Design a protein with these regions (language model features):
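A short, hydrophobic beta-strand element within the central beta-sheet of small alpha/beta folds
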Residues: 86-106
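Non-catalytic signal-transmission and effector/linker regions of two-component phosphorelay proteins
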Residues: 1-30, 77, 82, 86-93, ...
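Acidic, metal-coordinating helix/loop segments flanking the phosphotransfer/catalytic sites
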Residues: 44-60
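Acidic catalytic/metal-coordinating carboxylates
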Residues: 45, 71-77
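Two-component/phosphorelay signaling modules centered on CheY-like receiver
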Residues: 22-41, 48
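Active-site residues of response regulator receiver
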Residues: 64-66
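Alpha4 helix (beta4-alpha4-beta5 surface) of REC/receiver domains from two-component response regulators
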Residues: 74, 100-120, 132
Length: 143
């Protein structure tokens, strides 16, 4: 098996995914780790995802737009505020891909105006779509 992907800081690429549906998280984790050889941390709790982001450096975030207690946009805004202070060695702030349902597609145009938002994907997800979005969002070395 090849070595894990690395970014420009020569750190292993790592993605944090948070969504209330554990089936969605399993599909994301298995697709990315098996097909792209990128480490993925997952949590159905946005509060725990926040704690993980404080502890580790990530290359990309995938957040559910409609999360209980702390929605994906608010979670990302909170991380934008503190991430550079707790990870000063990082050369850039991770982008985000939001995951929504069909009824949330209206929000996607407004959300995509932020340059840090790499994509807004609608469920149900497919393996091909997940892999394509990740490849378009971060620099992935082709083997």
């Amino acid at each position: 098996m090849e070595a894990n992907q690395t970014n420009q800081d020569n750190r292993p690429l790592r993605i944090l995914a948070s969504h209330p549906d554990t089936g969605t998280l399993r599909l994301i984790r298995d697709s990315i780790s098996n097909l792209l050889n990128i480490e993925v941390d997952t949590s159905p709790s946005s509060e725990y995802a926040f704690q993980l982001a404080v502890k580790r450096h990530y290359s990309l975030f995938l957040f559910g737009i409609d999360m209980p207690n702390l929605n994906g946009q608010l979670l990302y805004d909170m991380l934008v505020t503190i991430y550079p202070k707790i990870h000063p060695e990082a050369s850039s702030f991770p982008g985000v891909v939001f995951i929504g349902n069909e009824n949330e597609s209206i929000k996607s145009d407004e959300i995509r105006k932020d340059a840090r938002v790499k994509d807004f994907i609608i469920r149900p997800l497919s393996i091909d779509r997940i892999v394509r979005v990740i490849k378009n969002s971060i620099q992935v070395n082709e083997s």
